Amino acid sequence: GEKIKSGQLAPYEWGQLDYKIKELYDAPMYVDDTPSLSVFELRTKARRLVREHGVKIIIIDYLQLMNASGMSFGSRQEEVSTISRSAKELNIPIIALSQLNRGVESREGIDGKRPQLSDLRESGAIEQDADMVCFIHRPEYYKIYSDEKGNDLHGMAEIIIAKHRNGAVGDVLLRFRGEFARFQNPDDDVIVPMPGEAPG
């Protein structure tokens, strides 16, 4: 990201950037950056996109930026419930990103830094209505470099499935490649370059 901002890219990186921009330009993706979008505006726009363009998934980045005004209770719970009902009505997944509260920062130890359902802002609403809740946890971010068994956690990430209405909960261990903003199987040491990427 910093290299793009500063314009300090190698020739192959410029080629890669050009390739990705063209790919994004041609992608069937719609970005709506309306500030303080209400859940009712979201539902109206989602219905139109599904009907006119066959949209298959909606991602909200992020829940706390939505405007809860105009709701019967003006509450986040009603907002999350409306999003959940919209997903069922449109028969598509809606992924809503959410902030964590500061509780995780004040807890100590390896397990203390793992996010929990209660760490979600407006956790009651999300816990009640979400079909699935997942967290991304990178121990290295908290300067935790090994687990209680001595396993190396440098560059590792966990996907914590904290709630799954129709399945099991659990953790998935992945390798996080920050330089590529990519997650991969922990056993995969070789990165297959994307088109336009330099090998290695």
Residue ranges and their predicted role:
Residues 12, 22-23, 36-55, 90, ...:
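C-terminal regions of RecA-like/P-loop NTPase motor modules
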